[in-house]
Amino acid sequence: MSGHNKWANIKHRKMAQDAKKSKIFTKIIRELMVAAREGGTDPNTNNALRAAIERAKAANMPKDTMEKAIKKGAGELEGQSFVEALYEVYAPGGVAMLIRALTDNKNRTAQEIRHLLSKHGGNMAESGSVAWMFERKGVITVPRSEISDMDEFQLLAIDAGAEDIQDEEDPVRIITAPEEASNVKNALEENGYTASYELTYIPKNTVSVSGNDAEKLLKLLNVLEDNDDVQEVYANFEMDDSEMEALMEKMQ
């Protein structure tokens, strides 16, 4: 059984290879702008900016494009102003969702999300009714092939500030408090590991979905991620691996 993390990995891998790459760039540019505006232009002291730069590099965004986005966010260049919005949602199968958007018009974005939810079996939740089901965390990933001694690796990560290590899949995931993510990543890199990280929301508990609910849920996730204003969708579901793969192939 796998959940939202596996879905996101599959989705991002396929998007990176197809015509939707320009959409990924648009989302990352907004992320860079907002992070620079809210926390400054130094990634060493701004974890959100550092995570956005990591994401930009992973998507092979040109350095010039990154730098322009950061300067726009800091006010050094003229550009649109985006604000963060977090929407709490109930999805098919009793799944809880957080939808994180960066938008220049909150009313438009809320209207578009409501429309998508109404078409795909979801609905907006009252403020506070879903957010408590998730925790803000840093997640660092390391290719499993680089880890020759898992015990030694785990000890290194824990000493650096890791809260949990999930080594059942590839890549290995290290969970940290948001403020510790950069320290843990640095410690791993200093010891020769290739580490990338993001700031995310992790569900405290999960709901198992299958059949019709599973198909409706993945369709909803797809259309939400295709919305220009939506940066990330976090959901608390578990699904059989083979069923998830089959449904995603069906939706291509």
UniProtKB/Swiss-Prot annotation:
InterPro entries: Integrase-like_N (IPR017856), TACO1_YebC-like_2nd/3rd_dom (IPR048300), TACO1_YebC_N (IPR049083), Transcrip_reg_TACO1-like (IPR002876), Transcrip_reg_TACO1-like_dom3 (IPR026564), YebC-like (IPR029072). The keyword Magnesium does not apply. Gene3D superfamilies: 1.10.10.200, 3.30.70.980. It holds the Pfam family TACO1_YebC_N. Keywords: Cytoplasm, DNA-binding, Transcription, Transcription regulation. Its main location: cytoplasm. It is found in: Cytoplasm. SUPFAM superfamilies: YebC-like. GO terms for molecular function: DNA binding. GO terms for biological process: regulation of DNA-templated transcription. Transmembrane segments: none annotated. Disulfide bonds: none annotated. NCBIfam families: PRK00110.1, PRK12378.1, YebC/PmpR family DNA-binding transcriptional regulator. This is Probable transcriptional regulatory protein Kole_1935. It comes from Kosmotoga olearia (strain ATCC BAA-1733 / DSM 21960 / TBF 19.5.1).
